[in-house]
From Swiss-Prot:
Subcellular location(s) of the protein: Cytoplasm
Cell inner membrane as UniProt keyword: no
SUPFAM superfamilies: Actin-like ATPase domain (SSF53067)
Keywords from the UniProt entry: Acyltransferase, Cytoplasm, Iron, Metal-binding, Transferase, tRNA processing
EC number: 2.3.1.234
Name under which the protein is recorded: tRNA N6-adenosine threonylcarbamoyltransferase
Lineage: Bacteria, Bacillati, Cyanobacteriota, Cyanophyceae, Synechococcales
Gene transcribed to yield this protein: tsaD
Length: 348
């Protein structure tokens, strides 16, 4: 058992959590959505300044809610990569300071590994190997999870991440920011079969298509052209039907690639992580397909789909128990493959 205090500031959520192995003692998340809504997206400089304003309050709230004190905390963990460099720096500086002042071990955590570990918070008995579909505003990946720190990326996006595509299409339809929840709400009132939209396929030099990689640029362009055509009509823009058709196309495409990937690699379990894991249509299609193929699929609770520090603490706990420690000289990295997690640690 390990009691870990973790900090997450990779983008626009300031989060602090305390986790005892895989049991959440406290989970504080301060979202900046309202701050960034007027800009239609995250402004890195604004995000960093907000983290500076919020981090101490979040730390105090997490400690108070957990009922624990510093003597019980065994290690300090923080997201160090990937993410917005300035935002990451706020969390890393706070974590290093706490580690030095309270003389605790320090662990830097990969953000995507945190999303992989989010499923453990509701499924503590989950065991590798399994396939993780990681879909968020910055990432769309199919990751073969072999064990703690042992990952192989089997598929990725060649252009926009799924969450990024949702944000851009929501802006196109004047649905606001963040786009994922806005499109999901509108789609519930629409018919997903109204418009036929293209699924992104990546051509291979030898012919055929890449089975696991995604592309959303063509779908985004198709939505733009379709919307422009419909606006030339005197009829009101069918926003709900457009949202439903777009969402269903993305969900079907991701489901098809995920099922093919898990079957090709002889796996029987799928987990889903990242903000887009909250999407109702993706959950429907994946659960239906998994049942058809007699596979298990696990989604984190909605509160652990978006960025949070509980998932970071959960990942750090396994590394801590494996004897992994990070040097206090470890810096932030705005880009780092999940396959390179081992670079963050020194094994004791």
């Amino acid at each position: 058992m390990a009691i870990i205090l973790a900090i997450e500031t990779s983008c626009d959520e300031t989060a602090v959590a305390i986790v005892n192995n895989r049991n959440v003692c406290s989970n504080v998340v301060s979202s900046q959505i309202q701050t960034h809504q007027i800009f239609g997206g995250v402004v890195p400089e604004v995000a960093s300044r907000q983290h500076l304003l919020l981090i101490n309050t979040c730390l105090d709230q997490a400690l108070q809610a957990s009922g624990l004190g510093w003597p019980e905390i065994e290690a300090i963990a923080v997201t160090v990569a990937p993410g917005l460099a300035g935002a990451l720096m706020v969390g890393v500086t706070a974590a290093k300071t706490l580690a030095m002042v309270h003389q605790k071990p320090f662990l830097g955590v990969h953000h995507l590994e945190g999303h992989i570990y989010a499923s453990y918070l509701s499924q503590p008995d989950l065991q590798p190997p399994f396939l993780c579909l990681l879909v968020s505003g910055g990432h769309t990946s199919l990751i073969h999870v072999k064990g703690c720190g042992d990952y192989r990326q089997l598929g990725t996006t060649r252009d926009d991440a799924a969450g990024e595509a949702f944000d851009k299409v929501a802006r196109l339809l004047d649905l606001g920011y963040p786009g994922g929840p806005a499109i999901d709400r509108a789609a519930k009132q629409g018919d997903p079969g109204t418009f036929k939209l293209p699924e992104g396929k990546i051509s291979l030099p030898q012919g055929g298509y890449h089975p696991y990689d995604s592309s959303f640029s063509g779908l985004k362009t198709a939505m733009l052209r379709l919307t422009q055509e419909l606006k030339q009509s005197s009829a009101p823009l069918p926003v709900d039907d457009l949202a439903a058709s777009f969402q269903d196309t993305v969900a079907r495409s991701l489901t098809k690639k995920t099922i093919q990937c898990v079957l090709d690699h002889g796996l029987t379990t799928i987990t889903v992580g990242g903000g887009v894991a909250a999407n109702s249509r993706l959950r429907y299609h994946l659960q239906t397909a998994a049942q058809e193929h007699q596979l298990q699929v696990f989604f984190p609770p909605l509160k652990f789909c978006t960025d949070n520090a509980a998932m970071i603490a959960c990942a750090a706990a396994d590394h801590f128990q494996n004897g992994d420690r990070s040097p206090l000289t470890l810096g932030v990295q705005s880009r780092l493959s999940v396959e390179q997690v081992s670079q963050l640690y020194e094994r004791n």
